[in-house]
Amino acid sequence: INQQIPQYVALVGEGKYDEAFEVIVNDNASPAITGSICDHQCQYKCTRLDYDESVLIRDMKKTAALKAQDKYTAGIRPAEIRSNKKAAILGAGAAGLATALFLRRNGMEAVVMDKRERPYGVVEYVIPEFRLSSDMVRKDLELVKRNGVEFKLGINENFSVDALKKEYD
């Protein structure tokens, strides 16, 4: 994801959760989810291991999300549409939602479509509740929706690509 980890870790350490969350969400479209289920490969190569133990980056991200995400999300105002282009994103998994979020933040209309009734794909349908609470998924979905991303869920999987191309860029 290429996040600004040193910045948000420092802010969480100072108890500045709102500021830390703003840094996180600038690059990460699913902060509550990744704060819960990231497999934290970085811990095994952390330079802090030379001194004591690795920095618990995932836990710090989750702390910021739990303490600041609802407030941040409530204050979101969708970006002004600055493009006459309209994007259709096929697939409402985490990657599709991230794509839509960043397009929408940058002033383009974005519509996420999926044959399933609920977004987030594997996150929603495969990962069990004891690993990832539905509340964390809800937080990230609300973040995407509040930014102005539209959803068309439960679509017929036999739709016409040609018809789609006429309506979207």
Task: Describe the predicted segments one by one.
Residues K85, M108, D169:
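Short coil/turn segments at beta-strand junctions that form active-site/ligand-binding loops
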Residues A163-D169:
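Core beta-strand elements of the Rossmann-like FAD/NAD(P) dinucleotide-binding domain
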Residues N2-E14, E19-I24, S54-R58, L90-N158, ...:
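Beta1-alpha1 glycine-rich phosphate/pyrophosphate-binding loop at the start
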Residues N28, H40, P119-Y120, F159-V161:
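Short secondary-structure capping/turn micro-motifs that flank functional sites
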Residues T63-I81, K139-I155, V161:
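Glycine-rich dinucleotide-binding loop and its adjacent helix/turn
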Residues I1-K86:
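Ferredoxin-type iron-sulfur electron-transfer modules and their immediate structural context
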